[in-house]
Amino acid sequence: WHAMEHNNSYGYLTDCQEVPITFPPQHQERQPGFEYVMEPKPVSECGKACRKLEGRTALITGGDSGIGRAVAYDFVKQGADVAIAYYDEDRDAEETAKRVQQLGGRCLLLRGDLKDTAFATYCVDKTLACFGKLDILVNNHAMQFIRRSILDISNEQLAFIFQNNVFSFFYLIKAALPHMKRGSCIINTTSVTAYQGNKDLIDYSATKGAIVALTRSLALSLVEKGIRVNAVAPGPIWTPARSP
């Protein structure tokens, strides 16, 4: 981020700039990828804890690796219990759960396909059964496939990427919302591609733009219920998602 100019009402205005980042070559034949095969290993630990989330329960999708894993570790250090929904990356998920336990937290692993509405409901139901409450929903999972032209994006891929990256967010929110009380929050992971675009990730960028619109609209819808809805838009991060 680059500080632009001082504003009396809002402090320093900022503008997102492209920063050259070079990642080591990486290719995995499947999505979602596996974090345990990455070299170097991503850094998932965070700084000091001040127990801001004591007594809270969070459901984090894609929490087996990457950004989701880092969020899980941070939340546990802040005092939360975590439920982690993931696809089939068992080794990564078990490593995350083991570290959560080492940090003194409790972790529930939920394996399945979030494109399935029944699994979204299952995740919420199991979280409630295990921890008795749901305070934080982190919709973090996503897939991306590099395509050099929009003509290379098949109709099947287009439907798949929207079902996985957008529709599943709706399924989880609809399943979780009846159980979330005032003071709860929903956090959606979008991307800088929603604002800047990406010529090789056209369909992925479109899903991230949809998540921005979902977040803003849902925030307006739930403000009177006292439920916050926010989005985080990361730039390039060294995760298994960067391996198609």
What are these model-predicted stretches?
Residues E18, T22-F23, D116, T121, ...:
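Conserved mid-core segment of classical short-chain dehydrogenase/reductases
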Residues L151, G183, Q196-I202, E224-K225:
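Active-site loop immediately N-terminal to the catalytic Tyr-X3-Lys motif
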Residues L151-F170, I187, I211:
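Catalytic Tyr-X3-Lys loop
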Residues I173, T207, T215:
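Active-site helix of classical SDR
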Residues P178-H179, L220-E224:
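Alpha-helical segment proximal to the catalytic Tyr-Lys
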Residues A233-P244:
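Short, flexible catalytic-loop segment of classical short-chain dehydrogenase/reductase
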